[in-house]
Amino acid sequence: MDLTAQNRQDRQDRRDGREGRDGGVRPRIPSPVGATLAEPRTLRVGGGVLHVAMSGALAVVGPWTPDASTGCARCAGLWRRDVEGDTAPDRPVPGLFPLWADVFTGLADAAAHGPEELRLALVALDCRTGEVTRHRLVPHPDCSHCFPGGAGLAVPGGLDLRTPRPVVGDALRTRSMDRADLRARLLDFRFGPAAHIYRDEESPLSLVTCETVAPGHTRREGGYGRSTRFSDSEVPAFLEGVERVTGGHRHTGAPTVSGSYADLADEALDPERLGLHEPEWYGHPAFDLVPYSPDVPTSWVWGWSTLERRRILVPEHVAYWHAGTEGTRFLYESSNGCAVGGTLEEAVLYGLFEVVERDAFLLAWYSRTRLREIATGTDPDLAHLTDLLDERGLRLRLLDLTSDLGIPTALAVVTAPEEAVRSGLAPALSLATGTHLDPRRAVMAAVEETATNALMYPKWVRMRASVDVERCRPMLEDFTLVRTLEDHTGMHGLWESRRHWEFLVSPTATVPVEGFAAGRPSSFAGADLTALLRERLDAVHALGLDVVVVDQSSAPYTDAAGVRSVKVVVPGALPMTFGHTHRRTRSLERLTRASTLFEGGVPWERHGQVHPVPHPFP
């Protein structure tokens, strides 16, 4: 037999599972033609199954799934549908495969003899071009084969306030996150869950955006990272993407409880303590929720009351901000209080930071409280951003937004002169907040965000018409037209909006940055994060407020990204909402004494008066 004939015979032997030229027994490789990722063909090998299938023009080998493990071809099919949406192929294109059958057989043969290489991975052969690509795979939370009935999605281990959690380095984190590892585990342009990551070279800081796919919803959530280096910005961008996806919908497999508050009052959180909507907006075209009464049924999930130390039911659409459909939602909710961390305790601490930050801003905004200004000092990073703003004629003010909850909170306010606003170079007002136990980190978080928003405005207007403040002019006369985040920021970007926020540029006094930071640590080296969390919880409890924690952790994300996810809810704190008719301030007693909750706070007008003007929070 000549060499060509021998090669042909070897190929046939590999397909048929007979002995090849090297004397080894070749497993029979099933053909992918006629199989799909939803209904793959499999080969038992190495204590598991190797999947093969067609996905449009792609001939796919993998993943290899050990027995009793997760991550299969069906997961890959679900992710591809999520990533590509309506463009994802439903049917294979078998006519192209014969051209590449031998190549595919070689790939499959190699996989069969080293299946562990395709654990949570797959190889795709594009039958249009012959290109071979390798892809990482994360088990899909909606895969009924891997997680039947949601079994296996929950992450074991509840909130533990006794076990020490040592801080890594001098940052307030319990583990360091590696950019390369997150890229390898999360980023894949075909199979997600992070489908795309990109940088903005024109930003004053190294701005990175990560588009993370929401499982089962073909919607991408944006995660953002800002720092002095693009490589450093990728880590927070990846993690914020995970935070928004796990916080939007329930991927934990945990059961829900159906009923009204009246039915479940002994075990449930009273929605009135969360702040209700104003009845005047019930039935308004911009109000897309059900009017609340204790008899309105909805779905609930279990959380943990840190004050009462017991399980407590929380409305699912409060715990997960995208949850629920019309007819089941009576409260508008945002991602406020969602956070991720290397441990559950770390996630809770950062979720609490966010609730405190938003609550403080809304207290000051709706009460029109004048605040103390913080002198900028000589910090080189802060000076750099201040110089960039000065070059554009923009003015930066730092305000002390620290409330009675006692965590350092800074408000950065950037204002533009009339000429710059009229010419479209900048919005009249940009602002952002930051909260952290390290006052410098609080200040820098606020300044970095608002400086980026103000300086990038001309570019973003060119990219998205919705950013242009001019389109918001009618909103000054009719607040019900304010529906989205960009409406909120856009309306206050108009020069004519100044009367609504003049109190923010009229500070009561000036304190040195050292005064803002007095008694606060700048390094957490050697600290115990659990102890710090206990201190903050005790401080909140001392005010008669609870901190309710909903564990949003989902096993596929915890395994891939190494983080736990939570939603922190503080009944009595003001919730962040978007849309004028969605404001939730009714039944929140703290708002009536808001000006007294800030050191040096003075109401612009009358103490206790509430000004229901849409906020400018980004």
Q: Where do the protein language model's features map onto the residues?
A:
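Helix-biased "structured C-terminal domain" signature
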Residues: 32-38, 42, 55, 116-618
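Generic signature of intrinsically disordered, low-complexity, basic-rich segments
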Residues: 106-108, 588
